[in-house]
C-alpha cells in the first residue's frame, strides 16, 4: 500500500496537472504556441476567430510572432502594430470573393454592439479608425490640415504632420471604402447599404472632420472632389435630399467641425441643387448647442458644446463640479433642458472637454452626461472605460 507521502505526491501531481489543463483553456496563444508557428506567416492566416477588444489584446500580446517572418514589415508605414493589423483586417477586402460573413467588419466587431461613444482624437490611437470600430464606437474624428493645396494630412499639431503616410485617405476614407465595398458586394446597386457594424449594419458612423487650416474653402473642395468622392459615388455617405427635404441615412455621416465653412454657397459649390448638382448635400455642420436655430434641422445632424461652456451657461463652473465630484440637480436640470431642445430639432448631442481625471470623477460625470442629461454621444479618450459605462 502507498504511504502517506506517496498519496500526497500523487494528489499534488494530479492538482498540478488539472491546473495546467484549465489554465490553457480560453486564453490567447502564448509564446510557446507561436514558437510552433515560426514558419507560418500572418499573410497565410485569414481569421484568428477573435473580435473586438479580444482581437486588439491578441495582437498586442503576440505582435513579434505575427510579424517576424514577414519581410514586408521591416519598413513601417505607420507603425509595425498598425501595418500588421491593417494587413490582416483588409486582406480579404482586396480579393474578388464576395463573403460578408468573413469580412473585415466581421473580424473587427462581430458580437460587439455599437455604443454611443465618440472616439475623441481617434487619430492618436495606435490603430486609427480600426480601434474605435473594434470597440463599437459609433462616432470618430480626424483633424485635417491642407498641405500644398492638394493633400489633407491628419494630426493634432501642424509641426508633427506626415503628408505621406498619415493622410485622410490612407487612415480613413481608403479603409472605409474597402470595408464597405466588402459588405455590400452582393448588391452594390441597392439603395440599402450595410454599414461598419456587424451586429447593426443599419447604424451610421458619425465621421467628424475637424478643419485646422485657414483656407477652409479649399479644404472642403478637396474633401468633396478627392477624399469623399468614391464614398459618394458608391452611395455610402448620408445626405440631405433637397427635393424631398429630408435626410437620407447611409453607412457614414460626415460632420464638419472646427474652422469649417458655413456659407451655403461654399457647401453647395455655388449651385442651387447641391455641390454635384444632384440635389444632395453630403456634409453636415456641427451645430452650436447653446445657440441653436430651426435651420440646423436641415444643416446638421448633431450639436456640440464643451463641458465648461455648458456649466458656465447654467450659472456654474466646471471646477466647482470637479471639486464636488458630480453635477448637482440645478446643473442637471439646466443642461438637460438644452439637450432636450436639440432633440426637438432631431439633433444628436455631444459634450466634449469633461473632466479627464481622476477615474472615479470621469466615471461619475460620464454617467451623468449619458443617463441624467440624455446626451447622445459620450466623448472619451479611453474606449475601454467608455465601454464599461454605457
Curated annotation (Swiss-Prot):
The keyword Signal applies. Keywords: Signal. GO terms for biological process: lipid metabolic process. One of its GO terms (molecular function) is phosphoric diester hydrolase activity. Residues 1-26 form the signal peptide. PANTHER family: ALTERED INHERITANCE OF MITOCHONDRIA PROTEIN 6 (PTHR31571:SF1). Belongs to the AIM6 family. This is Altered inheritance of mitochondria protein 6.
Amino acid at each position: 500500500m502507498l504511504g502517506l507521502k506517496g498519496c500526497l505526491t500523487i494528489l499534488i501531481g494530479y492538482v498540478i496537472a488539472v491546473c495546467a489543463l484549465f489554465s490553457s483553456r480560453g486564453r490567447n496563444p502564448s509564446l510557446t504556441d507561436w514558437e510552433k508557428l515560426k514558419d507560418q506567416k500572418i499573410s497565410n492566416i485569414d481569421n484568428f476567430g477573435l473580435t473586438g477588444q479580444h482581437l486588439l489584446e491578441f495582437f498586442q500580446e503576440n505582435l513579434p510572432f505575427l510579424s517576424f517572418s514577414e519581410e514586408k514589415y521591416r519598413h513601417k508605414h505607420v507603425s509595425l502594430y498598425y501595418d500588421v493589423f491593417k494587413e490582416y483586417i483588409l486582406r480579404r477586402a482586396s480579393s474578388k470573393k464576395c463573403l460578408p460573413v468573413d469580412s473585415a467588419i466581421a473580424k473587427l466587431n462581430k458580437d460587439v454592439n455599437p455604443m454611443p461613444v465618440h472616439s475623441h482624437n481617434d487619430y492618436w490611437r495606435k490603430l486609427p479608425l480600426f480601434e474605435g470600430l473594434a470597440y463599437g464606437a459609433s462616432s470618430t474624428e480626424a483633424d485635417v490640415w491642407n498641405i500644398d493645396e492638394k493633400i489633407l494630412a491628419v494630426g493634432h499639431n501642424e509641426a508633427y504632420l506626415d503628408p505621406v503616410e498619415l493622410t485622410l485617405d490612407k487612415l480613413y476614407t481608403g479603409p472605409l471604402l474597402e470595408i464597405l465595398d466588402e459588405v455590400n458586394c452582393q448588391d452594390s446597386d441597392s439603395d440599402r447599404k450595410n454599414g461598419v457594424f456587424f451586429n447593426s449594419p443599419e447604424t451610421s458612423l458619425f465621421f467628424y472632420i475637424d478643419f485646422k487650416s485657414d483656407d477652409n474653402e479649399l479644404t472642403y473642395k478637396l474633401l468633396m472632389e478627392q477624399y469623399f468622392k468614391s464614398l459618394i459615388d458608391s452611395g455610402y455617405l448620408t445626405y440631405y435630399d433637397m427635393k424631398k427635404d429630408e435626410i437620407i441615412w447611409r453607412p457614414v455621416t460626415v460632420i464638419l467641425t472646427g474652422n469649417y465653412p458655413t456659407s451655403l454657397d461654399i457647401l453647395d459649390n455655388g449651385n442651387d441643387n447641391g455641390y454635384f448638382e444632384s440635389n444632395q448635400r453630403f456634409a453636415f455642420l456641427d451645430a452650436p448647442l447653446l445657440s441653436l436655430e430651426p435651420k440646423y434641422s436641415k444643416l446638421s445632424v448633431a450639436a456640440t458644446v464643451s463641458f465648461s461652456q455648458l456649466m458656465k451657461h447654467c450659472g456654474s463652473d466646471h471646477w466647482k463640479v470637479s471639486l464636488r465630484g458630480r453635477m448637482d440637480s440645478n446643473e442637471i436640470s439646466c443642461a438637460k433642458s438644452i439637450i432636450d431642445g436639440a432633440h426637438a430639432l432631431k439633433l444628436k448631442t455631444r459634450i466634449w472637454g469633461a473632466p479627464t481625471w481622476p477615474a472615479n470623477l470621469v466615471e461619475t460625470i460620464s454617467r451623468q452626461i449619458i443617463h441624467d442629461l440624455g446626451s447622445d454621444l459620450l466623448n472619451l479618450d479611453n474606449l475601454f472605460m467608455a465601454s464599461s459605462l454605457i
